[in-house]
A protein has these predicted regions:
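Histidine- and aromatic-rich ligand-binding microenvironments
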Residues: 1, 20, 31-34
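Short, structured beta-strand/loop micro-motifs enriched in basic residues and often containing a Trp
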Residues: 1-6, 23-24
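Short histidine-centered loop motifs in beta-beta connectors
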Residues: 4-14
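Alpha-helix N-cap/helix-initiation motif
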Residues: 7, 27-29, 135
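Short hydrophobic beta/alpha edge segments that flank linear recognition/processing sites
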Residues: 12-29, 52-60
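Short alpha-helical basic/polar micro-motif
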Residues: 13-17, 36, 140-147
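Short, compositionally biased
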Residues: 29-45
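Buried, small/hydrophobic-residue-enriched core segments of structured protein domains
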Residues: 44-233
Length: 233
């Protein structure tokens, strides 16, 4: 996965929900966080102390999970958030790691700016959950996430959708540099690589970022009510 973790906790340590687990030595500002509250019972290393796994014993009762506090914003306040604040929030919450670079699918360097951002809001894989169902109750957060992500770069942010998703997003208020592109057809028309080929392929002199619609919804929720980003049930 092109990273070198530096552990910030020891075995037996109490950990909080969304507490930093380790940064990446290659990009020290890129943080990976704990997905639950409990105790780090095992940190397994292999040859040359290569990190293999981290075992977390979650609280059994599931009540009153302690978590790292995050800033929340109203919708009008989000429209005025500067790019640096958005990046800081994504880095601290570990949602920055949901973004991938083209063509090598690495976690991007936050100090660099991509030429364009591509968001996949369709899935043509067999038996895959349809995006028209998954974000049905998350459309407002999907729109918020799109508008926040569009501030990360100066060029276009593309979101490719199927016909039904396109209908769900009509009459929504989007940033001026965001463009929706509808794709139709059987698999592999919903693959990120396939659509990138037509919209704007990556190259050695053209850095692009991409991510999926579920992560866009999570980003919208993170800045709205961060305590609900990871369910406690």
């Amino acid at each position: 996965v092109y990273m070198k973790p530096t552990m910030l906790v020891a075995e037996g340590s109490k950990v909080l929900l969304s507490q930093p687990l380790f940064p990446d030595k290659i990009n020290p500002s890129v943080m990976f966080t704990f997905p639950g509250c409990g105790r780090a019972s095992l940190i397994k290393r292999g040859h040359q102390r290569k990190l293999q796994s981290v075992l977390i014993e979650l609280k059994q009762d599931g009540k009153g999970d302690e978590q790292v506090s995050r800033n929340s914003y109203t919708e009008p306040a989000m429209s005025n958030l500067p790019r640096d604040t958005i990046i800081e929030g994504l880095l601290a919450s570990s949602l920055w790691t949901s973004i991938r670079t083209g063509p090598f699918s690495k976690v991007p360097d936050p100090t660099r700016q991509a030429h364009s951002l591509f968001i996949n809001a369709m899935d043509t894989n067999q038996l895959a959950a349809q995006p028209t169902v998954v974000p049905k109750d998350g459309v407002p957060h999907f729109v918020l996430g799109l508008n926040l992500l569009s501030k990360l770069l100066q060029h276009k942010t593309y979101v490719w959708v199927g016909r039904k998703v396109d209908a769900q997003l009509k009459e929504k208020a989007f940033a001026s540099n965001l463009k929706a592109q509808e794709f139709r057809g059987a698999h592999p028309s919903g693959l990120t690589g396939t659509d990138l080929h037509y919209l704007g392929p990556a190259g050695s002199d053209k850095l692009i970022w991409s991510l999926n619609y579920q992560d866009v919804i999570a980003i919208g929720k993170l800045f709205t009510f961060p305590s609900r980003l990871i369910p406690h049930d």
